[in-house]
């Protein structure tokens, strides 16, 4: 009986700590992104991950090739990397280049030349959170942490002490420079994804994989 009375406040207290610790930062209209002035609040089902977006009607079938600019790391005053080391930012940028190249290549022919029927895609990393070492993994085995992660998984939310990545995407018609699509997003693994909890950047990398797949899915 005493153990049950003690366990309830402990679980409740842990959940309160999780709610406070995992609120995280949300992407904003970054001042140094070219398409920022055209972004509008997203009221769609994906608004929690994509709070701001812009788009015009596009017949994506008209485009058969794509130019992917080198993924850049955003250095504006409103960047959201916290105390992440520059080496880790560079690692994520390289991984993003690989993830978006691989996924765009499944839908389009990759090219370095602009022209009719060619898209130009710009991806700019604007923020990231590393997984809290030991704690992030422990939450998958802790009663309160597992409960929290289970709820977050259903809601499509971020796991306890899990990492994430934020970035801006701009898609242009390379021939005339028209902005076709743009958005800022925060991506992270499913809250119950245990493998993504191991390694400080694993969750952010998983987020980039998911984000690259999501972009291509919107171009069909």
Model-derived segments and spans:
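Bacterial N-terminal signal peptides that target proteins for export
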Residues: 1-11
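C-terminal motif of bacterial Sec signal peptides marking the signal peptidase cleavage site
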Residues: 18-21
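C-terminal/domain-edge helix-coil "capping" segments
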Residues: 23-55, 157-166, 170-220
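N-terminal post-signal-peptidase region of extra-cytosolic proteins
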Residues: 45-56, 85-86, 101-109, 151-155, ...
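N-terminal segment of the mature soluble domain
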Residues: 59-122
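Solvent-exposed loop/turn segments at secondary-structure junctions
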Residues: 73-75, 127-131, 187-190
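A solvent-exposed, charged loop/short amphipathic helix patch at secondary-structure junctions
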Residues: 79-92, 143-151, 193-196
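Surface-exposed short loop/turn segments
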Residues: 102, 106-175
């Amino acid at each position: 009986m005493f153990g049950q009375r003690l366990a309830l406040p402990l679980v409740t207290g842990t959940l309160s700590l999780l709610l406070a610790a995992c609120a995280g930062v949300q992407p904003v209209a970054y001042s140094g992104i070219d398409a920022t002035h055209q972004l509008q609040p997203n009221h769609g089902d994906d608004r929690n991950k994509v709070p701001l977006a812009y788009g015009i009607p596009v017949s994506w079938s008209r485009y058969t090739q794509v130019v992917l600019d080198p993924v850049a790391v955003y250095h504006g005053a409103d960047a959201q990397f916290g105390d992440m080391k520059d080496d880790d930012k560079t690692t994520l940028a390289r991984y993003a280049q690989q993830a978006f190249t691989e996924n765009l290549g499944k839908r389009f022919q990759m090219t370095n030349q602009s022209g009719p029927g060619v898209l130009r895609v710009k991806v700019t990393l604007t923020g990231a959170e590393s997984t809290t070492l030991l704690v992030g993994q422990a939450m998958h085995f802790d009663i309160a942490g597992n409960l929290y992660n289970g709820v977050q998984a259903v809601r499509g939310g971020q796991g306890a002490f899990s990492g994430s990545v934020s970035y801006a995407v701009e898609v242009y018609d390379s021939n005339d420079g028209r902005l076709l699509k743009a958005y800022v997003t925060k991506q992270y693994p499913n809250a119950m994804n245990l493998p993504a909890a191991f390694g400080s950047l694993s969750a952010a990398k998983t987020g980039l994989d998911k984000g690259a797949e999501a972009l291509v899915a919107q171009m069909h």
